């Protein structure tokens, strides 16, 4: 609209300020608003929006696509000159020395970063709460979690605070908040979007790199796709970045989708089964061919993820984190460790070798089924602090409920989440998984579902007027 000179930035700035004020009190998702500063930047750049719109070609499209697009970065990401305390009181005086690659790429494309969103301490929980800024609420219902660790991002974008939000995902931190808040996202393939934290005092260990990914959250799948393109531009600070094309060859004939058969030990709520069936029907009506099948060793894949991430964290980070974190953090982290095997050096090497075998099995599976339709969780969204109830409750959540989310991280595969329906007024989403660097296939399937299911955030806004 702005690029095509159908609408100036001024009404967009006024809309942004108004919705920001109305929504923030309802969610507490934003921690430090740069909306006023962003709006001033938008005003200065109004003429640039029109000039940018006259450019042509793919690079020009990237330059113009985010012009005047209000975006939010999560607290774990660095924005030059802004605090970067990551939910930890001991870090409250940390100021980012430079923009992260994601923020740099967004700004380069014309996006206006309007603020930073809330995260749990060290972004290490699936529930967004911390001693500095407290609990972030879910705009649909304060009695359910907004997810984590990008819960502030998911809550904000659902409530209309910004168009695109940024998060990252090492165990579900993009996809879980997207599900909880009824928005769309993509956890890209490892290496798709460059990552670097200029505030970090040490390099991240290897498997943390291989299992984590940066990504966007938005209300519309089309905006997720747009933001993925922008965020994916090269940055020399990330040696793991991969210059892979954003679209690959189209599979011949109708695309076969594997509806993942859920393990018998996962107690599936009827509302989740109904949402999966509804998503499968949407895909069938869009020309896909959906078949319920077993996916390769989802239990073993999840256990490999749990063992690797837990042992790497215990060795590299645990002692330092426990010194400066809250009792709630200790409870949640203690619960996450209960399902992990303690690995010596040989067992660690065996776990990393097992990871290779799991990836190979899934890549072969994608030869027949290019897309997998899977649950995000098999249960209704839990309460806002359920991970502080007990260690058993944490294990129940990660192993018994969101197994299909965390398992995908160890494979390094792209996974999109799109909302499908509401149950008792709360959103339910599904996950679309594709082969390495085939985010296009996952997003195509997500867009097909969205076209028939609609954009759930619009229903939320009707209740917020």
UniProtKB/Swiss-Prot annotation:
Which principal EC class is assigned to this enzyme? hydrolase
Report the InterPro entries cross-referenced here: Amidase, Amidase_CS, Amidase_dom, AS_sf
Keyword vocabulary terms for this entry: Auxin biosynthesis, Hydrolase
GO BP, sorted A to Z: auxin biosynthetic process
**Listed EC numbers:** 3.5.1.-
Output compositional bias ranges, type Basic and acidic residues.
Answer: 9-39
**SUPFAM superfamilies reported for this sequence:** Amidase signature (AS) enzymes
Q: Which residues form the active site?
A: 149 (charge relay system), 173 (acyl-ester intermediate)
- Spans annotated as Disordered: 1-40
Instruction: Give any GO molecular function from the UniProt entry.
Output: hydrolase activity
The pathway entry for this protein reads as: Plant hormone metabolism; auxin biosynthesis
Do you know which PROSITE patterns this protein is assigned to? AMIDASES
Recorded family membership: Belongs to the amidase family.
What function does this protein fulfil?
Hydrolyzes indole-3-acetamide (IAM) into indole-3-acetic acid (IAA).
Protein name in the entry:
Indoleacetamide hydrolase
Q: Which organism is it from?
A: Bradyrhizobium japonicum
The lineage is: Bacteria, Pseudomonadati, Pseudomonadota, Alphaproteobacteria, Hyphomicrobiales
